[in-house]
UniProtKB/Swiss-Prot annotation:
Keyword Methyltransferase assigned: yes
Reactions catalysed, as given in the entry: a 2-demethylmenaquinol + S-adenosyl-L-methionine = a menaquinol + S-adenosyl-L-homocysteine + H(+); a 2-methoxy-6-(all-trans-polyprenyl)benzene-1,4-diol + S-adenosyl-L-methionine = a 5-methoxy-2-methyl-3-(all-trans-polyprenyl)benzene-1,4-diol + S-adenosyl-L-homocysteine + H(+)
Described purpose of this protein according to its UniProt entry: Methyltransferase required for the conversion of demethylmenaquinol (DMKH2) to menaquinol (MKH2) and the conversion of 2-polyprenyl-6-methoxy-1,4-benzoquinol (DDMQH2) to 2-polyprenyl-3-methyl-6-methoxy-1,4-benzoquinol (DMQH2).
PANTHER family from the UniProt entry: 2-METHOXY-6-POLYPRENYL-1,4-BENZOQUINOL METHYLASE, MITOCHONDRIAL (PTHR43591:SF24), METHYLTRANSFERASE (PTHR43591)
Organism whose genome encodes this protein: Legionella pneumophila (strain Lens)
Gene this chain is encoded by: ubiE
Protein name stated in the entry: Ubiquinone/menaquinone biosynthesis C-methyltransferase UbiE
Amino acid sequence: MTNQKQTTHFGFKSVDWNEKEKKVAEVFHSVAKNYDRMNDLMSLGIHHLWKRYTIELSHVRPGQSVLDLAGGSGDLTRLLSQKVGDSGQVILADINAAMLHVGRDRLLDEGLFKNIRYVQGNAQCLPFADNSFHCITMGFGLRNVTDKDEALQSMYRVCKPGGKLMVLEFSTPVFPGLKPVYDWYSFNILPKIGKFVANDEASYQYLAESIRMHPDQETLKAMIERVGFEDCHYHNLSGGIVALHIAYKY
């Protein structure tokens, strides 16, 4: 870690730097079983459109190597595996063992195994060689990382020259009038859905808080460029509720 005596945020709470990783792990161990169902309910299924849009802009080709970081239950990995074909490879990496097992079991049940590997690893110190991947995707995971700068540096290291980084993450609404409605939904409805469906209100309260604490579009763009990626730009989806940042390593 950058500074083990430092504090950071866990939702709206201030916690010890080393404590956040443990608390986030507890959240995702708790939500893993109901993760897909909750995503569908919370977004009314729109998260599938955001992910398909990400894959469309990836321009991943057969034979390429792709890292799906914080790949969770495997939505992006499934789509990427179809793009790279049997001659390519997708590595689904996640720090959380419970989420990794959910993703692996789900994709195996769908008959997807020829070109997919599973790795449990920390985004801040990725266990891969330099210049390994043509494309790195990270869907709804960066806001949970303790040291985002360190994670982005690690992604830059393992990205091939000419490769691409794609970060799909909740962001700051830009559509006029959307933010107060979104805030009301996030803090009044999401935790109740979590309590009703998964008997876990606290984890979804953290979800809402973690979104508010995540850097906005321009701040994240600057962070990505600061570690060495170039030509970073972003697409606001659903009025900025979600943003897709794309950047390149030259």
